[in-house]
UniProtKB/Swiss-Prot annotation:
NCBIfam families: dephospho-CoA kinase. It is found in: Cytoplasm. This is Dephospho-CoA kinase. The gene is coaE. Pathway: Cofactor biosynthesis; coenzyme A biosynthesis; CoA from (R)-pantothenate: step 5/5. It comes from Hahella chejuensis (strain KCTC 2396).
Length: 208
């Protein structure tokens, strides 16, 4: 079993569904001088040219997934594994340990009172073992769908299918230590983040 790193910082796991506002919340924490690591970015980093994982992917799926300039064709890979549970399982078994190790290393180097791990799949993966508290950016599904359609120019059907692949709203709420209901404007979201920032500073001072 993965062990929680012996970090000095309180680690807040930040998660939420598509178009929930988790990226905006993470950006506000960064504005408040709180370091944030994005699990999605780490997932991209581990398959950059020169990374061993990229070579393993090419050997397993074929070199057609590698573009002429040596970069992984992410869209083609997603399409390949989307409807193939076995191939998806193989890919996750390769990438998840690499992603989690990089996150652990980053968390171990944090020196601030607290830091943020932002991950859309925090509750679906073992990344939840790396955090001390879970903050869910919550949003009603109707608002979520409208935002995702406007932001990404996707159809309602596609947005609903994406939502269906993620853990449900109630599941997230049940596993949250803290919840921000993000059904208003950005000013409201930022205000709620600022309040939690003060709370987390207090927690870090008294509990760590």
């Amino acid at each position: 079993m993965n062990q929680i790193p012996q970090h000095k910082s309180l680690v807040i796991g930040l998660t939420g569904g598509i178009a929930s506002g988790k990226s905006a919340a993470a950006a506000k924490f960064v504005e408040l001088d709180i370091p944030c690591i994005d699990a999605d970015q780490v997932a991209r980093d581990v398959v950059e040219p020169g990374e061993p994982a990229l070579q393993h992917i090419a050997e397993h799926f074929g070199s057609a997934l590698i573009t002429p300039n040596g970069v992984l064709d992410r869209a083609a890979l997603r399409k390949l594994v989307f409807n193939d549970p076995e191939q998806k399982k193989w890919l996750e078994s390769l990438l998840h340990p690499l992603i989690n190790q990089r996150i652990r290393d980053w968390l171990g180097a944090c020196k601030t009172p607290y830091c943020i791990l932002a991950s859309p799949l925090l509750l679906e993966t073992r990344q939840r073992e790396l955090v001390d508290r879970i903050l869910v950016i919550d949003v009603p599904e109707s608002v979520q769908i409208a935002r995702a359609m406007a932001r990404d120019q996707n159809s309602e059907d596609l947005v609903r299918r994406i939502i269906a692949t993620q853990s449900g709203r109630e599941y997230k709420r049940q596993h949250a230590d803290d919840i921000i209901l993000n059904d208003k404007d950005l000013a409201h979201l930022y205000h709620e983040v600022a309040k939690l920032h003060e709370y987390y500073l207090e927690l870090a001072q008294h509990d760590r």
